[in-house]
Curated annotation (Swiss-Prot):
The organism's place on the tree of life at top rank: Bacteria
Family per record: Belongs to the MG439/MG440 family.
Protein name per UniProt: Uncharacterized protein MPN_466
Organism per entry: Mycoplasma pneumoniae (strain ATCC 29342 / M129 / Subtype 1) (Mycoplasmoides pneumoniae)
Length: 140
């Protein structure tokens, strides 16, 4: 799979108004045959599509100091030596919207099959995400 970021815009003044809009272009190279739920792909097939993504705070859940998480983990061993590791993250209640658009007819048919089988809710579903990790994944 190849991924290219076409557009990434993040606005932020506080966690109440954080907004991310992104457009990512994907190329899937199928290295084997795959079939599930009416979706099929053959070895050597390529599918091209764009992912449009919007992330904003979930209006039903307020952001508080409790969303800043810390955890001390004493069980990490590196090179035979036990080390203390402090983990920090932001648990962000996000409202996510996305859409997939195939760049050609074959890819669009694959997208339609995928959405009808696996991801039929693309409009404003909520999820708690680790904001740092999620943004790092999008940007990489």
């Amino acid at each position: 799979m190849e991924r290219k970021i076409e557009h990434f815009q993040m606005t932020y003044q506080s966690f109440k108004d954080l907004s991310v809009e992104a457009k990512l272009s994907y190329t899937f190279n199928w290295f084997g045959d795959y079939s599930s739920g009416g979706f099929t792909a053959k070895k050597g097939d390529k599918h091209y599509f764009d992912l449009f993504l919007k992330i904003k705070p979930d209006a039903k859940k307020s952001f508080t100091i409790a969303n800043f998480k810390t955890e001390e983990d004493n069980s990490t061993t590196i090179g035979g030596k036990e080390t203390t590791r402090n983990l920090e993250w932001i648990e962000f209640s996000a409202s996510l919207k996305f859409s997939l658009k195939g760049k050609d007819d074959v890819s669009q048919k694959s997208v339609n099959k995928f959405l009808s089988t696996f991801a039929n809710n693309t409009e404003g579903y909520s999820s708690n995400i680790n904001l740092f990790i999620y943004l790092e994944y999008l940007i990489k």
